[in-house]
Amino acid sequence: MPMITPDEIDFEKYERETDAKRKVKPASQWVQELIDRIKNPTYQPRSVMPWRKTHKLIQFRPGEVTVWGGANGNGKSLVTGQVALSMCGQDEKVCIASFEMKPSKTLERMARQWSTYNVSDPAFQGDERATAQFLDLYEQFRDWTDNKLWLYDQQGTVTASQVCAVVRYCAKEKGITQFFVDSLMKCVA
């Protein structure tokens, strides 16, 4: 699976791009888009969460930000991992920046969610047939995630400008459409 490591990329290039230069534009620039939407309504595909009862309530549109909040240890990483897998299944390209867990730990959890099996379950320990099935499942998972799922390999604190640079890099260079930051508390000034 492709990894994004901080040492391989000139993130300073992306940090030098100022928001003011790229983002401040006259409001009139968007009026024609509003007119076109009224004249020619189109369906915009949107990603949904993996739970059917949420499909009409919550959708993820391109260019928008979603913040997942909750107390420490309440399962935000677990839920967002499941949502990330669902988005991969909807042909989104996803990158996860987990500053609290190593990529292998994040991926181990996601592999359990994807396969619905826990390789650490004592019921499977010592069973050669189960081990062979797990190895096969992990190989399938590896192949399934290829060109769908990336992990940013950075633990500990990181600056907000570095996170923005990584997001821009992922969008421009990798075509990433969904970026998960876990956790914002690790982003410092």
Region spans (language model):
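Accessory, often N-terminal, substrate/partner-engagement and coupling regions
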Residues: 1-17
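Generic detection of intrinsically disordered/low-complexity segments and helix-coil linkers/edges
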Residues: 5-8, 24, 45, 128
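The Walker A/P-loop phosphate-binding site
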Residues: 14-117
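Cytosolic-facing regulatory segments adjacent to core modules
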Residues: 55-56, 89-175
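Structural motif
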Residues: 67, 151, 177-180
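Short glycine-centered, acidic/aromatic-flanked micro-motifs in structured strand/loop junctions
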Residues: 70, 153, 183
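Helical hairpin unit composed of two closely spaced alpha helices linked by a short loop
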Residues: 177-189
